[in-house]
């Protein structure tokens, strides 16, 4: 089992036997786990290309790949959206330092696995699923950018 899957399985197990109210409380607890943006990402929310437009809550995400193709997720989410912030904190914690393939291979039914789809309602669930898909799209975009940069460097050095 991949690292991301193991991390998510552990989180899903925390939600398993909870009632609706307890699930929401746990999700709110996770919102406290979202890392504070490092200074180099402080202006994330001012850049519209990082906004997840499908989400009603202003959510700004930046995906970076390190030299080993490991994923790092940076997020800026309004404090008045703790459920969204909690979900992003779960994804960030599960995906940080994982390979691109691990994250891209993740199923999009995490809300159902956690039993949150019915608790959160259709609109919020749709927005949270959009966040998952945004992360995958941005990883593909980052891979393409790294590939182009490497190809350009090889041509310049040839």
Where are the regions a protein language model picked out?
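Short connector loops at helix/strand junctions that flank enzyme active sites
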Residues: 54-58, 68-72, 85-87
């Amino acid at each position: 089992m991949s690292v991301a899957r193991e991390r998510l399985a552990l989180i899903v197990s925390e939600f398993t036997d909870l009632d609706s109210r307890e699930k929401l409380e746990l999700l709110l607890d996770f919102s406290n786990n979202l890392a504070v943006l490092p200074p180099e990402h402080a202006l994330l929310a001012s850049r519209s290309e990082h906004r997840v437009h499908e989400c009603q809550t202003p959510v700004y995400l930046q995906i970076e790949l390190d030299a080993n193709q490991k994923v790092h997720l940076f997020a800026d989410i309004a404090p008045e959206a703790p459920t969204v912030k909690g979900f992003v904190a779960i994804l960030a914690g599960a995906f940080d330092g994982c390979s691109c393939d691990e994250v891209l291979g993740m199923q999009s039914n995490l809300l159902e696995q956690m039993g949150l789809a019915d608790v959160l309602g259709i609109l919020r669930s749709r927005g949270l699923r959009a966040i998952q898909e945004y992360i995958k799209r941005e990883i593909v975009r980052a891979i393409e950018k790294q590939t182009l940069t490497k190809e350009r460097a090889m041509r310049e050095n040839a």
